[in-house]
């Protein structure tokens, strides 16, 4: 056993190394777990894992059933990185409980216990079994009698070399392996073999066959259920486990199995019943699943009940563990650990792997450990152990006891402490020391004595209040304990206090104004000073709120605040805070902002009629300026936004909180809001009122644009614009259509009960074509009839023209254009003519695909464009009016001319001499399917102009008189009876810079743009004839 002095030296040495290495006791990273090892495993090796960290590296040893495992005495054992390896494990020698023990210079900890068991399954000893003889209808049990084994088993049966399936008549108990047949039938005769499987090793063995035969002495009569398989009276179930309860009965008829809880509670929905209902399975078992369960077996002869109690248990589980503690000598240690479990866990404590008992300084009470007046011998590894009959858990922690002389190396006194006259100063003295030292203070060379101004706290800090200039100087803290003495010195510098000379003053301003709140001080200029401002308790961010706030002043003793374009939101308390390294002070002012009123509140519709609404409201904040008036606004589903409405009184003053809105439309849903105003401006509107609909009234607005005409023979068509919904004044809105022949006295009336109706057609054989009628349209709703529209004249449907146009003639103008001529119909024509319709189609097309164009009025010719060249077209003409088209004229034929030449002029050459430009080009030859060339068009323009001039010539040259200071853009194309041919590429002729120049169509030139000349002289000279 080490002496306390040796422990102190060792601990001091470890603390010296702490800067480079983290020294600590053992800590389990992985603890051993229970192992079920298959005896027939091909890998003849068992590993019990144990991984530990610590510094110094811990030494690992193992215990088996409480006795140390001697690795050196048995070559089969080895420890690899803490884990225990057992080669060729032996069931007799190696079965038992193992524990890993880890030790280093800080102490020892023990792991949880881990059991090593061996799984095996031997063969059945008996070779044959006796024949079982039963009556038909009798219940039967075939015993399995599994051979010696270790590890969980599963059971099945083979019937005549085939698996025996379980159903409501047959059941295999997984507890005993026995096969139960509730009621034997003739088909059950045969050989039965029990099949046993070890679920750990997967090894399977078959029992000897048991023959089953039927007796010849009759059939078993009916009898009530006899429960042969039932779960125990008490079934302990672990938290989170899967619980299986078995129950099966013999009987005739075959009994049904029903499960229920004896306390009347429903069985959890998560529970499952197997095919035969002989097993009730409850997964993830919890406290609420515990209770009394009943199995009810019933048939027509009666029923029987088996009962059992399923109890809940849980292994201990940590709720609170212990943690490492570093404590100074002579102080106290308190640890507490808590664990859940059922039954409730008990606690014990270990120190360095050995039991820890209560004695003078050590008090143990359940999960608490209290050590007083700690000394070096208390250092070590501690473990709290919580256990119940279902398990044991361990929590570990290290207790380090610190013993050292006072040391200021890392906690020197502050070199300079600044304080103001009249202020307070605290000089901290925090040396590292264990146990706690005794403190004394010196000022200069004199020991400080406590008085009403000077106190020394228990933890060594020096406090001086009401500081004066004489308190300046050097101060030394001296710390002493059993192991030595140390000191540290610092200086106190006393400064004059800061004073606010010009504080901010409260002000009353108007929205939009700008002000400056002053904040000017006197202070010790050897100290840095910082001004900050808060607004309603929040620090002003001058970067974020720079649009409104700015620091002004220009000197270190002034921190004035400018507020620009003040808004209502800027009203509140402003605080100027001044801080130096020795003091902090503040000055506050209130800013009152006058502005437009806030929104009125609680706008309510007190009463509403067909055209009025009585409103009331509560005033909102006046923002420090009396409200002078209110404006009422309304909105409907048909309005564009909010609209001001008329009220009584016409002007609502600021002391009136009710008004009547007039001029509303009946049967329209309205909502209202109020806007307040004062001398400063108009405020925000109130929240909208509830929506209310005005009452119904007679309609007052008549349809607009009453007209008509058209339609079919013997019809009078009357049309109008519907009355908007907001002007219909009520439900059941419709129209009354009145009409009479012009000059007659009696009106004919028709009622249309639809607000959407906008057209009425009167049909009668007596209606003559294009006869005038007087027409008016009235309105009505559920309240009654409203007015009629003004009377207007509408003509009945007219008759389409009855005669075709005469003298149809067509001529070709070009390859794409033709012109058509005709004369008005000859003889009496009953229908009015509004114009003519020309139909045309190519000879290769069908007439039904013909195109049509129309003329208006008396026009008797038209031009048709965009046709195909050298193609035969057929044309016919009809007269038309609103009733339709009349008969068609006879068709005439016309052939468009051949297309113009497709080849553009080539080999274009130009020469300039004596201010003239002479252009020459090759003659264009038309193809066989093209019309002959009649001449050429020369298109030219100045470089900076968009308008183009044209010269026509039947020659292949042209002479132009051009200015000297402008480029020319020129194109040339042929023309023929078929129209204009393809154009040449554009030619740029540069301005004339010398007396002679020449070029071709491919040449280019860089030209400078000069001022335009207003006149161009052009002369033509024939070079060759076509």
UniProtKB/Swiss-Prot annotation:
It holds the Pfam family I-set. Residues 687-696 have a biased composition (Basic and acidic residues). A lipid is attached at residue 1000 (GPI-anchor amidated serine). Residues 32-117, 122-206, 225-311, 316-400, 406-493, 497-586 form the Ig-like C2-type domain. GO terms for cellular component: axon; extracellular region; plasma membrane; side of membrane; synapse. InterPro entries: CNTN4_Ig6, FN3_dom, FN3_sf, Ig-like_dom, Ig-like_dom_sf, Ig-like_fold, Ig_I-set, Ig_sub. Keywords: Cell adhesion, Cell membrane, Disulfide bond, Glycoprotein, GPI-anchor, Immunoglobulin domain, Lipoprotein, Membrane, Repeat, Secreted, Signal. It is a lipid-anchor; GPI-anchor. The keyword Nucleotide-binding does not apply. Specifically expressed in the nervous system. Not expressed in heart, spleen, lung, liver, kidney or skeletal muscle. In the hippocampus, it is highly expressed in CA1 pyramidal cells and weakly expressed in other regions of the hippocampus. Residues 1-18 form the signal peptide. Residues 599-697, 702-799, 804-899, 900-995 form the Fibronectin type-III domain. Glycans are attached at residues 65, 90, 191, 370, 375, 466, 705, 764, 858, 893, 911, 929, 954. It is found in: Cell membrane; Secreted. Residues 685-710 are annotated as: Disordered. Residues 1001-1026 form a propeptide. The keyword Aminoacyl-tRNA synthetase does not apply. One of its GO terms (biological process) is homophilic cell adhesion via plasma membrane adhesion molecules. Disulfide bonds join 50-100, 144-194, 247-295, 337-384, 429-477, 519-576. Contactins mediate cell surface interactions during nervous system development. Has some neurite outgrowth-promoting activity. May be involved in synaptogenesis. Belongs to the immunoglobulin superfamily. Contactin family. PANTHER family: CONTACTIN 3B-RELATED, PROTEIN SIDEKICK. This is Contactin-4.
């Amino acid at each position: 056993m080490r002496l306390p002095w040796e422990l102190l030296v060792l601990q001091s040495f470890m603390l010296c190394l702490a800067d480079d290495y983290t020294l600590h006791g053992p800590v389990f990273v992985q603890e051993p777990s229970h192992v079920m090892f298959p005896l027939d495993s091909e890998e003849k090796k068992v590993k019990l894992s144990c991984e530990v960290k610590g510094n110094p590296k811990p030494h690992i040893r193992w215990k088996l059933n409480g006795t140390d495992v001697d690795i050196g005495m048995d070559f089969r054992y080895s420890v690899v990185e803490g884990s225990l390896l057992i080669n060729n494990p032996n069931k007799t020698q190696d079965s038992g409980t193992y524990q890993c023990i880890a030790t280093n210079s800080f102490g020892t900890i023990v792991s949880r216990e881990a059991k090593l068991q061996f799984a095996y399954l031997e063969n059945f000893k008996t070779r044959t079994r006796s024949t079982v003889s039963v009556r038909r209808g009798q219940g039967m049990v075939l015993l399995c009698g599994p051979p010696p084994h270790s590890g969980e088993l599963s059971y099945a049966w083979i019937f005549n070399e085939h698996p025996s399936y379980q159903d409501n008549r047959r059941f295999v108990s997984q507890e005993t392996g026995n096969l139960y047949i509730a009621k034997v039938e003739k088909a059950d005769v045969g050989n039965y073999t029990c099949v046993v499987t070890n679920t750990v090793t997967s090894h399977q063995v078959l029992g000897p066959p048991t023959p089953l035969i039927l007796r010849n002495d009759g059939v078993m009569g009916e009898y009530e259920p006899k429960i042969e398989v039932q779960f125990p009276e008490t079934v302990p179930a672990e938290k989170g486990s899967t619980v299986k309860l078995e129950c099966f009965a013999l009987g005739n008829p075959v009994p049904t199995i029903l499960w229920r809880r004896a306390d009347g509670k429903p069985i959890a929905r998560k529970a499952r019943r197997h095919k035969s209902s002989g097993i009730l399975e409850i997964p993830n078992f919890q406290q609420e699943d515990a209770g009394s369960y009943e199995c009810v077996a019933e048939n027509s002869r009666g029923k029987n009940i088996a009962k059992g109690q399923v109890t809940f248990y849980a292994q201990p589980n940590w709720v609170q563990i212990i943690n490492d503690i570093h404590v100074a000598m002579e102080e106290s240690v308190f640890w507490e650990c808590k664990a859940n479990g059922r039954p409730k866990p008990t606690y014990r404590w270990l120190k360095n792997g050995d039991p820890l008992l209560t004695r003078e300084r050590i008090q143990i009470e359940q999960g608490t450990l209290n050590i007083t007046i700690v000394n070096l011998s208390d250092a070590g590894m501690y473990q709290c152990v919580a256990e119940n009959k279902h398990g044991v858990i361990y929590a570990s922690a290290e207790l380090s006891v610190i013993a050292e002389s006072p040391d200021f190396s890392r906690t020197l006194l502050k070199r300079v402490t600044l304080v103001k006259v009249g202020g307070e100063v605290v000089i901290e003295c925090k040396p590292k020391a264990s146990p706690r030292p005794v403190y004394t203070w010196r000022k200069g060379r004199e020991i400080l004595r406590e008085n009403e101004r000077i106190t020394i706290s228990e933890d060594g800090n020096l406090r001086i209040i009401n500081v004066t200039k004489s308190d300046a100087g050097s101060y030394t803290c001296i710390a002493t304990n059993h192991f030595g003495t140390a000191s540290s010195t610092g200086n106190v510098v006393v400064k004059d206090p800061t004073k606010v000379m010009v504080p901010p003053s409260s002000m009353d301003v108007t929205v939009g104004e700008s002000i400056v709140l002053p904040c000017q001080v006197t202070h010790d200029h050897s100290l840095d000073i910082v001004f900050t401002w808060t607004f309603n308790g929040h620090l002003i961010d001058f970067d974020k709120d720079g649009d409104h706030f700015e620091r002004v002043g220009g000197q270190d003793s002034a921190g004035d605040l400018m507020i620009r374009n003040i808004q209502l939101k800027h009203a509140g308390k402003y605080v100027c805070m001044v801080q130096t390294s020795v003091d902090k002070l503040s000055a506050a002012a209130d800013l009152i902002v006058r502005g437009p009123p806030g929104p009125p509140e609680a706008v309510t519709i007190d009463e509403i009629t067909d055209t009025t609404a009585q409103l009331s409201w509560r005033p909102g904040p006046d923002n420090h300026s009396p409200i002078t008036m209110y404006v009422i606004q309304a909105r409907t589903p048909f309005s564009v936004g909010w609209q001001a409405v008329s009220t009584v009184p016409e002007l609502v003053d600021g002391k009136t909180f009710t008004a009547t809105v007039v001029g509303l439309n009946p049967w329209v849903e309205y909502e209202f809001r109020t806007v307040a105003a004062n001398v400063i401006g108009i405020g925000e509107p109130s929240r909208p009122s509830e929506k209310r609909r005005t009452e119904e009234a007679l309609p007052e607005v008549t349809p607009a644009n009453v007209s008509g005409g058209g339609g079919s023979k013997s019809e009078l068509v009357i049309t109008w614009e519907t009355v908007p919904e907001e002007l219909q004044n009520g439900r059941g809105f419709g129209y009354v259509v009145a009409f009479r022949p012009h000059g007659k006295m009696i009106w004919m009336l028709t009622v249309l009960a639809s607000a959407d109706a906008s057209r009425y057609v009167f049909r009668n054989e007596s209606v003559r074509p294009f006869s005038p009628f007087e027409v008016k349209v009235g309105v009505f709703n559920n309240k009654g009839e409203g007015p009629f529209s003004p009377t207007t004249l509408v003509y009945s449907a007219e008759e389409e023209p009855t005669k075709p146009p005469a003298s149809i003639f067509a001529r070709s103008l070009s390859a794409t254009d033709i012109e058509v001529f005709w004369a008005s119909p000859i003889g009496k024509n009953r229908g009015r003519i509004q114009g003519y319709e020309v139909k045309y189609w190519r000879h290769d097309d069908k007439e039904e695909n013909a195109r049509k164009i129309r003329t208006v009025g008396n026009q008797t010719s038209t031009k048709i464009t965009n046709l195909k060249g050298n193609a035969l077209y057929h044309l016919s003409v009809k007269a038309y009016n609103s009733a339709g088209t009349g008969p068609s004229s006879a068709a005439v034929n016309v052939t468009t001319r051949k297309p113009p030449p497709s080849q553009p002029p080539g080999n274009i050459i130009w020469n300039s001499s004596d201010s003239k430009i002479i252009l020459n080009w090759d003659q264009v030859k038309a193809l066989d399917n093209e019309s002959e060339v009649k001449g050429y068009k020369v298109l030219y323009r100045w470089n900076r102009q968009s308008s183009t001039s044209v010269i026509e010539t039947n020659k292949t040259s042209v002479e132009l008189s051009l200015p000297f200071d402008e480029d020319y853009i020129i194109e040339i194309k042929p023309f023929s009876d078929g129209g204009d041919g393809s154009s040449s590429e554009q030619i740029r002729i540069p301005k004339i810079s010398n007396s002679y120049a020449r070029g071709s169509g491919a040449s280019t030139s860089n030209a400078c743009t000069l001022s335009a000349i207003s006149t161009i002289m052009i002369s033509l000279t024939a070079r060759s004839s076509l």
